From Swiss-Prot:
CDD domains hit by this protein: pyridoxal_pyridoxamine_kinase
Function: B6-vitamer kinase involved in the salvage pathway of pyridoxal 5'-phosphate (PLP). Catalyzes the phosphorylation of pyridoxine (PN), pyridoxal (PL), and pyridoxamine (PM), forming their respective 5'-phosphorylated esters, i.e. PNP, PLP and PMP.
Binding site for substrate: 23, 59, 233
Taxonomic source organism: Escherichia coli O7:K1 (strain IAI39 / ExPEC)
Catalytic activity reported: pyridoxal + ATP = pyridoxal 5'-phosphate + ADP + H(+); pyridoxine + ATP = pyridoxine 5'-phosphate + ADP + H(+); pyridoxamine + ATP = pyridoxamine 5'-phosphate + ADP + H(+)
Gene: pdxK
Cofactor(s) demanded: Mg(2+)
Keyword Magnesium: yes
Protein name in the entry: Pyridoxine/pyridoxal/pyridoxamine kinase
Subunit: Homodimer.
Entries under InterPro entries matching the protein: PdxK, PM/HMP-P_kinase-1, PyrdxlKinase, Ribokinase-like
Length: 283
């Protein structure tokens, strides 16, 4: 391998604003397959670390792939430091994780990374399941989130079902959901964005609730009837981009929600089952 060595000047290394750790598909627009282009549209540099590599989501008649082996996963993370590509790192985001062991490996990497990046923003989307499907990850993942990732995160973006799993509390009404979110806050975890709080069914509205120690903001947006997948991944990509571009949290959440609605409508207009990002000229 040494005879192949061409690039050893670390001063020339590409630098990332964000490391995004989540699923990747060959076909489709979920996980990093939608998050990376969305983040890049915002003018930010992102490195994608896959947790699973799949042919497509399981919602098609064929489906191939699986979780990245731990040795590879830890190597992907380690290589970013070996390439000296994290000097300007500002945020790490997590989405769908393949195994509990990946969560532990990631937490160990983040803990070490924090020593050189004390202001690093860690945003965790604790992908566990939803009300309609129940838990759709391996059964040991919720406890791994609680034990390893939540203590490191500054912000998390659970849906109502995931908030219930993480807290053990019923969250089916707004007050209960807010109380559950507040129970997770700590010196490290500064905010919880509940991405699917109950809304006004008659007015076809959904609510996103932004909870911090000193404020609660409820944001209502239109409910779009759709089977599109990856909207949560897109929302998180837009949210972290907005935060890094200087938006206040509630404003960043509001803008991210509007962008997701725009992308969904654009996708429907183009009669696609996979999210399509509008070109910048149309964004």
């Amino acid at each position: 391998m040494s005879s192949l060595l061409l690039f050893n000047d670390k001063s020339r290394a590409l630098q990332a604003d964000i490391v995004a750790v989540q699923s990747q598909v060959v076909y489709g627009s979920v996980g990093n397959s939608i998050a990376v282009p969305a983040i890049k549209q915002n003018g930010l540099n992102v490195f994608a670390v896959p947790t699973v590599l799949l042919s497509n989501t399981p919602h098609y008649d064929t489906f191939y792939g699986g979780a990245i082996p731990d040795e590879w996963f830890s190597g992907y993370l380690r290589a970013l430091q070996e390439r000296d590509a994290l000097r300007q790192l500002r945020a790490v985001t997590t989405g769908y994780m393949g195994t509990a062991s990946q969560i532990k490996i990631l937490a160990e990497w983040l803990t070490a990374l924090r020593k050189d990046h004390p202001d690093l923003l860690i945003m965790v989307d604790p992908v566990i399941g939803d009300i309609d499907s129940g838990i759709y990850v391996k059964p040991d993942l919720p406890e791994a989130y609680r034990q390893y990732l939540l203590p490191l995160a500054q912000g998390i973006t659970p849906n109502i079902f995931e908030l219930e799993i993480l807290t053990g509390k019923n969250c089916r009404d707004l007050d209960s959901a807010i109380a559950a979110a507040k129970s997770l806050l700590s010196d490290t975890l500064k905010w919880v964005v509940i991405t699917s709080a109950s809304g006004n069914e008659e007015n076809q509205e959904m609510q996103v609730v932004v909870v911090s120690a000193d404020s609660v903001n409820v944001i209502s947006h239109s409910r779009v009837k759709t089977d599109l997948k990856g909207t949560g991944d897109l929302f998180c990509a837009q949210l972290i981009s907005g935060l890094l571009k200087g938006k206040e949290l509630t404003n960043a959440v509001h803008s991210a929600g509007l962008r997701v609605l725009e992308v969904m409508r654009y996708t429907q207009q183009h009669e696609s089952d996979e999210l399509i990002l509008p070109p910048l000229a149309e964004a």
